[in-house]
A protein has these predicted regions:
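Intrinsically disordered, low-complexity regulatory segments
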Residues: 1-174, 439, 457
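Conserved short loop/turn motifs at secondary-structure junctions
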Residues: 1-3, 108-110, 189-192, 266-275, ...
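Basic, low-complexity terminal or inter-domain segments flanking catalytic cores
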Residues: 2-3, 22, 123, 153-154, ...
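Amphipathic alpha-helical transducer elements in NTP-driven molecular machines
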Residues: 9-12, 16, 43-46, 50, ...
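Structured, non-catalytic alpha/beta "coupling" segments that mediate domain-domain communication
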Residues: 30-62, 200-245, 393-441, 547, ...
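C-terminal or mid-to-C-terminal helical accessory/interaction module adjacent to the motor/catalytic core
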Residues: 85, 90-91, 98-99, 139-228, ...
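Metal- or metallocofactor-binding catalytic centers and their adjacent structured scaffolds
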Residues: 153, 243-277, 283, 449
Length: 575
C-alpha cells in the first residue's frame, strides 16, 4: 500500500477519481468540519488534510502578555513550540504509514505545499519509509495519472525556506504585537496592534503614499497650444514653469495666422504581444477588471484549477517548456467560447509559438486548458477565465502595427509640434483585454508649406500628486520592492483591511487613522526593520535556503537577534 497525502479534501477526491473507482473511509473525528477521511483506490490510500496541520505557538507560561514575555520570545529558542492545529491527523497518518511501502506527498505544488509536506513528514518522524513528491500542473485525470509515473524527490530545502519564513514571522509577529500593544495602548488605542514583517512594510507603503499626497504642494505651469486645420499643436518648450516667459511667447504668437510646416516624420512601430501569464499578472489584471481583492482573484483561480479549466495558478514562470503542446491545447479551445474564431486563425496560420518572459522552473505559465461558456453560474470565475483565455491567445498573436506621425512647424519662429498614432493592424489586440493605445489623429501636412493658424491659447495647469494605490498597483509595487511572495502578497491587503489599518473605497486604498498612528510611532526606532529593503533582504535569504546555500535555523537565529536589538531600540526611544 502507498500512502498519499493531499492538502485539501477536494484534491484528494480528484486524485482518487483519476486513479479509478474509490471508496471513502472515516479515520476519525465527527461532523463535517472535523471528520478525517481517506480515499482507497488500487493500492493507494489517499488522506486529505485541511491546509497546515501544525503551527508555532508560545508555551503556557508565556501566554500572558508582558514585556518579559517579549524578551523570552526574542531570546529563548524554546519560547516557540510547534504544535498540531488538528491533533486528529497524527495517529491515523502514523498508523497508515507503518503499513505503507511508500509515502507520496501530494500537497499543492508550490513552496507552501512543500512546507505542509514537511509537517506530514514531521508527524511521521521515526517511521522510515521512502518519500516521493507528486507535482501537478493540472487536475486533468490523464495528467494526474501521468504525474504518478514520474514522481519527484521531496524538496527539503524549499520546505525549509518556508519554515524559516513562518518561524521568523512568528518570532517578529508575536514579540512586536505584544510590545506595541503594551507600549502604545494609550497613544494608538487599546485594541491589539498587530505587527507583521510583510504586513507592516506594506502598510508603510500605503502611509508613505498618503503623506506624499497630503504634503504635496501643486506647482502652476503653462502650456501654449495652437490649432492648425483640425490638429492641436503644443509649443516644444511646454510646460513652462516661468509664467513671465510663457506670457512673453504667447504674446508673440497669439495674433499670428501663419504656421510653417518644417518637417513631417512617419515611422512604423510594432508592439509585441504580452509575455505568458504568471500569478502576479493574473492578480493585477483580475483585481483591476473584476474590482475584487487579489486574494479573491486567487480563490477564483483555485476553483478553476480544481475544475480542470486552467493550469496551476501559483506560478512565477513566464516561459513555456519546449514540451508543452500548444497546437493540441489550442484545439481544445476551438469550441464553447467567444474566441474560437481567433484560436482557429492561429492554428490555420501556424501561429503556435508563444512569447517568452522570465524563466522559473516551477510550473508552466497559467493556461486555459478547457473551453467553457459559463462556470457553475459563478459570473466572476467565468470572467476571470475569459481574461486568462484572452491573455493566452494573445501571446501567439502577431504584433500590433502603428504608424507614428510627428509634425514640426513654426509660428513667428517659435517651434510647435503635434504627435499622432494610428493603428493600422490590430494584431494580438484583436483578442487582448487592453485596447490599443492610439494618440489623437492628426491631419496631413506637407513640409515647407504654410497653413492657417485658427487659434492660439495659453493654458494654466497645476502639477498633481501621485495617485493612491489600487489593489493592482500596490501588488505591483510590492513585487518591485521585493516584499512578500506570490503566496503571501494576495492576502496582505485583506489582512491590513481586517486589522483596520487600511480601508478601500472604489478600489482605492486609504490608510486609517490607526494605521497612520502605528507607523508614526514605530518608523523612527524601527525604520530599518519595516523598510522594504529589510523585508526584501529576508526574502533573498530565504531564497538562499531554498537553493541549499544557507541553513534555515541559522537564518532564524540571526533574524531573532536583529529584532531583539530593534525592540531594545524601541524601548530606549520610548523612555
Amino acid at each position: 500500500m502507498k500512502l498519499v497525502v493531499t492538502e485539501k479534501q477536494r484534491m484528494g477526491q480528484l486524485i482518487a477519481s483519476a486513479l479509478g473507482q474509490y471508496r471513502v473511509k472515516t479515520l476519525g473525528g465527527q461532523g463535517k468540519r472535523s471528520r478525517i477521511i481517506s480515499y482507497e483506490v488500487l493500492d493507494y490510500v489517499i488522506v486529505p488534510l485541511s491546509g497546515h496541520i501544525m503551527n508555532y505557538v508560545t508555551p503556557k507560561e508565556l501566554e500572558r502578555w508582558t514585556h518579559s514575555s517579549v524578551d523570552a520570545i526574542l531570546n529563548d529558542p524554546k519560547s516557540l513550540v510547534k504544535v498540531f492545529q488538528r491533533k486528529g491527523y497524527s495517529q491515523p497518518l502514523r498508523n497508515l504509514a507503518l503499513n505503507a511501502s511508500e509515502v507520496i506527498i501530494a500537497t499543492d505544488s508550490d513552496d507552501e505545499g512543500e512546507n505542509i509536506g514537511l509537517e506530514v513528514l514531521e508527524t511521521l518522524r521515526g517511521i522510515q519509509k521512502p518519500v516521493k513528491r507528486l507535482w501537478l500542473n493540472t487536475t486533468v485525470p490523464s495528467d494526474i495519472r501521468e504525474s504518478f509515473s514520474r514522481l519527484r524527490q521531496f524538496n527539503y530545502n524549499l520546505a525549509f525556506s518556508v519554515e524559516a519564513r513562518r518561524k521568523i514571522d512568528a518570532v517578529v509577529g508575536f514579540s512586536a504585537t505584544r510590545e506595541l500593544s503594551l507600549s502604545l495602548k494609550y497613544k494608538v488605542g487599546k485594541s491589539v496592534l498587530s505587527f507583521g514583517r510583510v504586513q507592516t512594510t506594506t502598510l508603510l507603503l500605503v502611509v508613505d503614499r498618503e503623506r506624499e499626497i497630503t504634503n504635496f504642494i501643486p506647482k502652476p505651469f503653462w502650456e501654449i497650444t495652437a490649432k492648425v486645420k483640425k490638429t492641436n499643436f503644443i509649443h516644444q518648450s511646454s510646460p513652462f514653469f516661468d509664467r513671465t516667459k510663457a506670457c512673453e511667447i504667447f504674446e508673440k504668437v497669439r495674433k499670428s495666422k501663419q504656421f510653417l510646416c518644417t518637417n513631417v516624420r512617419e515611422e512604423t512601430t510594432l508592439v509585441q504581444p504580452p509575455k505568458p501569464m504568471n500569478t502576479q499578472e493574473m492578480l493585477r489584471v483580475g483585481s483591476s477588471f473584476l474590482h475584487i481583492s487579489p486574494s479573491k482573484v486567487l480563490g477564483l483561480a483555485e476553483e478553476l484549477y480544481l475544475s480542470s479549466i486552467i493550469t496551476y495558478p501559483r506560478v512565477d514562470n513566464q516561459t513555456y517548456s519546449h514540451s508543452f503542446n500548444h497546437k493540441s491545447n489550442l484545439q481544445k479551445l476551438l469550441s464553447g467560447n467567444n474566441f474560437k474564431d481567433y484560436a482557429s486563425k492561429l492554428l490555420q496560420n501556424n501561429l503556435t509559438i508563444p512569447t517568452r518572459g522570465k524563466l522559473s522552473e516551477d510550473h508552466e505559465p497559467i493556461t486555459p486548458i478547457a473551453s467553457i461558456t459559463e462556470y457553475q453560474k459563478n459570473t466572476l470565475a467565468f470572467r476571470l477565465y475569459e481574461l486568462i483565455l484572452r491573455h493566452y491567445l494573445s501571446i501567439f498573436g502577431p504584433p500590433a502595427k502603428f504608424v507614428d506621425t510627428t509634425v514640426d512647424g513654426l509660428i513667428q519662429v517659435e517651434p510647435f509640434r503635434a504627435d499622432g498614432r494610428k493603428l493600422v493592424d490590430r494584431g494580438f489586440y484583436a483578442v487582448y483585454y487592453y485596447p490599443p493605445k492610439e494618440k489623437v489623429m492628426i491631419d496631413v501636412f506637407q513640409p515647407n508649406t504654410t497653413y492657417l493658424v485658427e487659434g492660439v491659447d495659453i493654458l494654466e495647469k497645476k502639477t498633481a500628486p501621485p495617485p493612491r494605490y489600487s489593489n493592482s498597483s500596490l501588488l505591483a509595487e510590492m513585487e518591485r520592492a521585493g516584499i512578500g511572495t506570490k503566496s503571501t502578497r494576495p492576502t496582505m491587503i485583506e489582512t491590513l483591511r481586517d486589522r483596520q489599518y487600511v480601508r478601500t473605497n472604489k478600489n482605492v486604498i486609504y490608510p486609517t487613522e490607526k494605521g497612520m498612528k502605528l507607523i508614526e510611532h514605530i518608523e523612527k526606532p524601527w525604520g530599518n526593520y519595516i523598510s522594504p529593503k529589510f523585508t526584501s533582504r529576508v526574502e533573498e535569504e530565504m531564497e538562499k535556503v531554498a537553493r541549499g546555500e544557507k541553513n534555515w535555523e541559522e537564518l532564524v537565529s540571526s533574524e531573532r537577534r536583529a529584532f531583539a536589538e530593534a525592540v531594545a531600540t524601541f524601548r530606549k526611544n520610548r523612555s
